[in-house]
């Protein structure tokens, strides 16, 4: 019966939990001995067995699996035998606590004293596993943390400290007593988390009893106690696991990053060394106080021969005192280092930098550019040494305040160096930082998959058990019934089976220890009951009580009333009304602003009361209609009631001061929109989902932030207090310091936001460089890069496009759509009725209903009333499902919903019954309904027409792609248009119907001429040259726009040329447009989006041309129209394939990007309104206009006091430019906070704000920081990352749509395919032949050794180090030493180059790396030679620097060695084409915006971010500014001056010399639109596409590198092959095969002894016992990847490919295989043996016969019979020796393989043989005869 099979799967019950006794211990020891013996046996017999693993669901720390039921109370807290079969022969036991958690202990004596049975240890274990114990420890840790945050702890805190130490010591003692110290598994120190405890406690005692000097540094170690929380909270360990995993995975990326940064830092060091110290120094110096005229002498210093000369200030004669006309007191050093002589810009701490090249920054009059003083930012920003350069580049890579570094460098070195920054931002910043993201995301995804798989497995196991159990139960029932029938009495009790408690066999296949029986039935039934109960959250009496109290059905009239209310409240129109109210309410809240009139304020407050009333009424009515019991079952209703209650509370407390924040809760009503707005709903869900997973992560983040905040406070707090004067001129603590916990926390949070460098400078200034760098970079790397990226990875994983595309749940209509459907139906009804009236016949309602369909049903406009999401095309994978779901609605599929169910009501509630299912995703037509469907739903005309897509990559008339008419299938078109050169019709059919005059007969007369003309035009337009010409014109006209800068007025010639050119371009484009109209016809031209774009841009040109003729060119509107010419470059879009691809991808993503954008705006709206509530009108301050200092509140307290001072003239009551005075400005402020640019000023203003119209006071409102912290977490981290999510998702979807190449392969096949793809493209290279010459040969051997390569690598590293040692201002000695070292390196590398060329001869240049080396060597030598020339003759030092960079090329050779780095670079290489396209698009956007910026902001006042170098005056400057903002850096600074709209901020009447433009004011509205749109386009879209591509390719690259066989393995195979096949014949001898496969490296290697293995590979052989390389590689690949039946077809295709690539293989056909060969050998040996035996027997017989013959020779008495026999005997054994010899030799020839004798023709083969082997080609005389021909059919099968 079933009982035999059941033991494996019967779930174990609580009876399996047996106490651990000395007998159990003895049994374990016994099993251990047996296991050891078994392993020994297996080892001797060479039996491999799978490795046993512990069961994952029985790990320590997890809960006892459900299957075991509830453990009885008596087994709780006592040692039990281990349940896991893995530990059956290991000395362990488990203990369960009340929460059913498993604790595993070692059964050896703890601390050598306490056995598992000793009373002390048992007590310790009981304490350790108790829930209260961990609770107590947790509380202790938290209390301890609170004490740690005190910046000035009271005196008694010392004793508290001792208490904590005591508690921790006690905890560790308990653990050691229970577990043992460190010898066995599961002891105290075997758990890494306990190392933490141990070190913390040790440190506590050490610091107490040993005086170690700097205590504060050691005290900081106590902070690690906070990490202990991780051990106590269960979910945290997994997240920390994921973090640690991702850090391991990051190693490659980290190495690559450090390497790249080092290379970049070296480049920076060589290029900009010492540049940042060039300052504007007052020149010439004043001789004495009276003689001031001397340095006011104009002619002297503006003398051009001095100014701008690179080297004059180094000239010693000037520095010597004698040259100063006898004034020997002048001290040059002191003069140039005195800050008083430097030129400072207003409000800046650092002197103005300058440079000596023409495009660098220049000094104002009276100043010269001299290298003096220290570097900017306390001297910490520089490229003077390698370390500072590295820091600068790391900062650049993390994009922190990099605009400052960018501006300083460009000012000092010149604008051309922008290229350096472009490379680093794109390669370093975007690429490397996103690689880190990619790695973290992958690590997280892998971890997730693993857990999911594990759960799945358990689930399946459990299901199987249930199945078995059910069967078992049935069988038992049957047995019982049978028994009852037989015996006639009741069978009592369950029969109990004896079975293994584990319900599973040991992994080794042997049963585990025998255990007492346990009943399967009870176990499962218990488990089932438990599951049932788990689903019910509360005890049963609770439900009874709830039913009584919360369901109101008292009397019949009430129930009736309730029903009526229900019908009203649940009506779709009510929902619509409520939604409209929500929107209106939001509008009302958003209309608050400052300053607001009394009346407006009253209107708003009344409005608020009305809305509160409406929402309260809705809630009350719903409560009545649904009963509280039902009402509170729905999440939305709970949400509503919460908000309504809050609104009412807020009304009650309206006048209480400080509770205005409660008003912000009304904003949550906005979220009610989510009910009817799927995207918002989905987004809230995504955030909800990720908050679950993020809960733990946030905790980890909080712990990290806490730890670092405390560390910072402990380490640096005092220093900030003591050395504050170094960083603050007024010696007050700055806003960012670490003197108390809150400020320390803010600094750490700021670092997490990616802003670390500025606070780090302060810290380094007060507390020393080493400590600050360490702490800050740790926070940066751990917090920002790893944790925040994990955050993003989680978001991405809980995000998926499917949810975006079709999130309308179950396709249920929401009430809004029903309501709107009804309204549309009503309008249709009225329309039909009125039309009827107009036609003079009155239609009855029935007729109208017949024509329209039911209300809300398939009405006229039903198509439009479909919800947005339904129109959107579902992603391919959901397609089937989606189609079904739409058809289900209509009742057209036999889905779960039968058509009958779709009764009349469903029709009414379903306004989108007519949706037709889209066919394939690529087709734009809607599917045509079949006839029955058309009859069923009256289908309006306009829906039946296929929709023409807006953008269509293929059919762009205005692009080079061939034009295909949109309406027809290509096949039809081909039939109608044989040459494909027929123009389409000009007008649509509808036009021709309306105006018959448009119809032209093209068969005769003028019509025919017209047709000929159109065909001619068509030919012209379709010609390639025409297209090329137009592209050229577009580029030229775009280029012309770049010249129209502020200097155009002064350059008359250029201006005139441009004016004429502009006209020419306009005429050309008009001509092009007319040609296309004639050629394509209006219909085609105007149905193409790209053509519309051309049309509009040409229109702009025409209008400005006409205005010029009429003389209106100076009119305002015309001028602003002219700025639209900036859009010209857009026409290039459709003409460049690469850009068009990107644009199409982007356009595809626009719907979902817009969706997310809208949702973000809603999300931000809440924060914006909250900001207006909190800060409107509070940012104003009173300022002294001369010193621009803010008055203290003791002087000026509010606006009126300020105004009373104003008449003195020097006082102004002004506002911060970016503020919260209304919702619009609130949005701008939030954008600045979210991009972390300009957020400081906003935060400072918020923190200082008091009340409306009051003077702010320093940090009076400190906790307003939290508003920003919360916004940054939700508004910035979440919402901005959602953009990345959407874009990446869309990207993947589109890839699925278009690139589904490998969708039709199984996973196995994909692996093979990829391996083969690499394989087929390679063929063995002919190795470079060893030279014949003896000396050359020796050199060759030396050069090709691996040791040689390695030593060169080491030298390259050393060279890198010597380059790093260089510094600015190094001593002459150091310069000489470095020069000599460099010389040595150049000699060595030149030597290497020469040696290689000598040894490899002309083959040297066949290897890419060698060419690279050669170029580097040449450049190094040239650089060395030129450096002397440069010092002698003044060539620009820039050239000199660039030449020195050549040396860095040598470092790049290191990449050859590292495999992991190669993968990453491979990913970069793979993404390059796509990135190039995106770069082009980005440049296009920048180009258009810079033209626009030049025409709008060229004359803006120079302040904050706009100055003499960074402005919109010329095209170059604009591009530089826009490049900066592409990463959103510094856009606040550029926006600030543009926000000046009038005096006193700027002067609208100011004259700008050289032009007739007046004023230096900006245009705030245009400025804000300009910057916000640019940031959204470039930063959010383009940059995120960059990220998406990198993630994508990184995944591909890692997949390739993680595949069992990579490129490298094949490379290695061919490298080894070259040694065995020096002539590249592609064949090797069978005899050498064994050595060959042994020489390979893993995974292809087959180590010796490998003869048998090779035979089983069954390799094909050709005459001469040779084997082809590809066959070997195929076989080895198969060996590594495992065999799969699908291989053969694939192999076939691969072979064909290889044949095509390598013609040499075509010539051979294999005639046998190694396996066959072996079989033949075996046969041959057998035949030989048999034949030898036969010969032996014969010779024995012969001998005996001869002997007898000789005996009986004379005897003639032999009978006749004997004579006959003798004859035969003679024949056989007689004197025919020779013949026998020949015969035997022939036979042996045929069979044997060892002796190769004379060739013999093979015998004819039987048919089965022919099937096995192809017919052989004629054999060359040298080769041995073909084998395998003589083997009888069936031999192969019989022999192995």
Curated annotation (Swiss-Prot):
Repeat (III) residue spans along the chain: 1006-1319
Intramembrane residue numbers: 386-410, 741-761, 1224-1245, 1515-1537
Regulation: Potently inhibited by tetrodotoxin and saxitoxin. Inhibited by the conotoxin GVIIJ.
Residues annotated as glycosylated: 288, 291, 297, 303, 309, 315, 327, 356, 1198
Gene3D superfamilies associated with the record: 1.10.287.70, EF-hand, iswi atpase, Voltage-gated potassium channels. Chain C
Effect of residue 1803 to K: In strain: COP; prostatic cancer cell lines
Ranges of compositional bias, category Pro residues: 1814-1824
Segments of skewed composition (Acidic residues): 925-940, 968-983
Gene Ontology terms describing biological process: choline transport; membrane depolarization during action potential; monoatomic cation transport; neuronal action potential; potassium ion transport; regulation of skeletal muscle contraction by action potential; sodium ion transmembrane transport; sodium ion transport
Disulfide bonding pattern of the chain: 280-354, 363-369, 725-731, 763-772, 1546-1561
Feature: compositional bias, Basic and acidic residues: 36-60, 868-884
Membrane topology of the entry: Multi-pass membrane protein
Transmembrane regions listed in the UniProt entry: 132-150, 158-178, 193-210, 217-233, 253-272, 418-438, 573-591, 603-622, 637-656, 659-676, 693-711, 773-791, 1026-1043, 1057-1075, 1090-1108, 1117-1135, 1153-1172, 1263-1284, 1348-1365, 1377-1395, 1408-1425, 1439-1455, 1475-1492, 1568-1590
Comment text on domains: The sequence contains 4 internal repeats, each with 5 hydrophobic segments (S1, S2, S3, S5, S6) and one positively charged segment (S4). Segments S4 are probably the voltage-sensors and are characterized by a series of positively charged amino acids at every third position.
Function, as annotated: Pore-forming subunit of Nav1.4, a voltage-gated sodium (Nav) channel that directly mediates the depolarizing phase of action potentials in excitable membranes. Navs, also called VGSCs (voltage-gated sodium channels) or VDSCs (voltage-dependent sodium channels), operate by switching between closed and open conformations depending on the voltage difference across the membrane. In the open conformation they allow Na(+) ions to selectively pass through the pore, along their electrochemical gradient.
Protein name as annotated: Sodium channel protein type 4 subunit alpha
Species name: Rattus norvegicus (Rat)
Phylogenetic classification of the source organism: Eukaryota, Metazoa, Chordata, Craniata, Vertebrata
